[in-house]
A protein has these predicted regions:
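Conserved glycine-centered short motifs in functionally critical loops
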Residues: 1-121
Length: 121
């Protein structure tokens, strides 16, 4: 399971708090879709966007996320924001995971641990 927590950081903006939160969440939705593709992350993914009061804003952020993920060839399913403000989604796993792709079988324990490849040491 992958969990993503969105925060404003230092980006507090010059507009109202609600508008700043909305803008940050929209930007985060696009970037999350990009990072999921780049890192080939699959399985269950939970996103904790910054709390938004306006239902239209919440719906738009989920819509932006769905649009950004539509560019991905990997099948995804995005569910509406829950009462706790979480977006749950699934993304089909394709290929091996990050650890498996960047490591070799340990010659001492025969696969019970990992030895990272020389290129990432």
């Amino acid at each position: 399971m992958t969990v993503i927590d969105v925060n404003t950081g230092k980006n507090v903006g010059k507009s109202s708090l609600g508008e700043t939160v909305y803008q940050n969440n929209m930007e985060a939705a696009r970037e999350i879709a990009r990072q999921l593709r780049l890192r080939d992350i699959g399985g269950i993914i939970v996103i904790d966007f910054i709390d938004m009061e306006d239902k239209a804003h919440r719906d738009m952020v989920v819509s932006i996320l769905r649009q950004a993920l539509a560019e991905d060839k990997t099948p995804t399913q995005v569910y509406p924001i829950s009462d706790l403000g979480l977006v749950e989604m699934t993304r089909k796993r394709i290929g091996e995971g990050l650890v498996e792709s960047l490591s070799d079988e340990c010659p001492h324990c025969h696969g019970m641990g990992y030895i990272f490849e020389n290129r990432i040491k």
